[in-house]
Swiss-Prot record:
PANTHER family: 60S ACIDIC RIBOSOMAL PROTEIN FAMILY MEMBER (PTHR21141), LARGE RIBOSOMAL SUBUNIT PROTEIN P2 (PTHR21141:SF5). Residues 63-84 have a biased composition (Low complexity). CDD domains: Ribosomal_P2. GO terms for biological process: cytoplasmic translational elongation; fatty acid biosynthetic process; lipid biosynthetic process. Belongs to the eukaryotic ribosomal protein P1/P2 family. The phosphorylated form is part of the ribosomal stalk involved in the interaction of the elongation factors with the ribosome during protein synthesis. The phosphopantetheinylated form is part of the 10S triacylglycerol biosynthetic complex involved in de novo fatty acid biosynthesis. This is Large ribosomal subunit protein P2. It is found in: Cytoplasm.
Length: 110
């Protein structure tokens, strides 16, 4: 991830096609050692591509992934309750163990 961040930093600074050496310099400025193998794969995968198009394509792919959006919102609301919510959470682990066997209709080997 650090390699991608350094690459995107260079692109946002105006370098449309950063080299491995450019990325290494950015990482070295933050006292981070570059992983040569990962860096070479990153440079090879992004060579000749517009980063904005790659990001847009990735966003489209992520948008099509089901995320079960209601569950995190419910969890966030419970966390805002404070100490009372923590006490209730300690009382419920036994119920969660029973629910963990429920595959919600998605059998792994069906």
């Amino acid at each position: 991830m650090k390699h991608v961040a350094a690459y995107l930093l260079l692109v946002s600074a105006g370098n449309t096609s950063p080299s491995a050496e450019d990325v290494k310099k950015v990482l070295a400025a933050a006292d981070i050692q570059a992983d040569e193998e990962r860096l070479s794969v990153l440079i090879k995968e992004l060579e000749g591509k517009d980063v904005n198009e790659v990001i847009a394509e990735g966003s489209k792919k992520l948008a099509s992934v089901p995320s079960g959006g209601a569950a995190p919102a419910a969890a966030a609301g419970g966390a805002a309750a404070g100490g009372a919510a923590e006490e209730k959470a300690e009382d419920k682990p036994a119920e969660k163990d029973e629910e963990s066997d429920d595959d919600m209709g998605f059998g792994l080997f069906d």
